[in-house]
UniProtKB/Swiss-Prot annotation:
Predominant localisation class: plastid
Region feature G2, mapped onto this chain: 61-65
Protein name: Elongation factor Tu, apicoplast
Database matches in PROSITE patterns: G_TR_1, G_TR_2
Native species: Theileria parva (East coast fever infection agent)
Amino acid sequence: MSKEQFLRNKPHVNIGTIGHVDHGKTTLTSAITSVLKLKGCTEKSYSYEDIDSTKEEKKRGITINTTHVEYESDLRHYAHIDCPGHADYIKNMIIGAVQMDGAILVISLEDGPMPQTIEHLLLAKQIGIKKLVVFLNKEDKVDDEEIIFFIKEETKSMLDKYGFDSTLTPLITGSALKALEEIKLLKEIDLNNKWISKVINLIDTVDSYIEKPERNLNKPFLMPIEDSFYITGRGTVVTGRIENGIVKLNDKVELYGYDKSKLTSVIGIEMFNKGLSQGESGDNVGLLLRGIIKEDVKRGHVVAKPKSLKFYSEFKATLYILTSKEGGRTNPFKIGYKPQFFIRTLDITGEIKKLYSTTNENNTLELAIPGDNINANISLSKSIVLEKELRFSVREGGKTIGHGIIIDLIK
């Protein structure tokens, strides 16, 4: 029996829920899918347990790529990332493995913005999310309009502080849990129900405010590998988000590891357990590769058009060093510093070999001070595929301390 085919009849957008623990991110994800099913836009809804159990399975290593929930609105097809309890959540946000085109920031009206709210907002800005919609959840628990007004003002101030325009960013109040409860109580479809209509308002706002990104369809195919698994009798599947180009069934591709590569071909393409004849830039897909064993593949490897990439271990980059207020270091670092470099889906140790002015390579520097915009020569512990203009993050001790862009490749 052939697998159901994925129908590409609406623009595809990657979105995610971010915010403090227990503010209702997973409940909201469930409510969105349930309301859209009620409207007849999407076939499947997900319960809280559906979404939460996939996180537990992921922790135990049973399933792959379960952080994505699929749904359709009137206008779009969405891949929705909901993994607040996932061990790699922060890491994945940073490296862009679950790169989002936009986000829904969930804040409980019982608590207002909390430490993790700020952490996720800062991360969203750091990984290049330009627009988000705020959902002020648990409105049913707060009957004081002054408290709601105060939290809205506090949220606007926080948005401005971290580079999101509060005059443009939509703030929507509602209760994800009440919407789910009301759907269960309904004897007939009522989209005007107070709590259900608020979730519909959120979905419509996401449709209109979060812009559809430009996809790099004309560049050579490239997909950083987020995960892989072996299907008995079929072979190895690699999962990830296609960064550039298009891949079709039976295309020849090259699997790039550390300083070595292997030619293979694509014998299966899937998105959300549905077959595809081709995957496109922006799609979260699984690719079944011919003749590849699981041991050939690691997270951070890249699958791409043959002979389109080269290996490098040393490069020049322009760095911005975050200040302590931006979540970075309080102290400067010097030549010989060895942090982690998060490049695509890979995190790898590297060493700062040289620090110098962005305007004059001969103007060498002894220290990189938080707040500096400087150039550096960086040597990685292994050779990997790199390109000019590739962006990366620099991490140390569980926090981001800088961002960079490759300006030249050395060796």
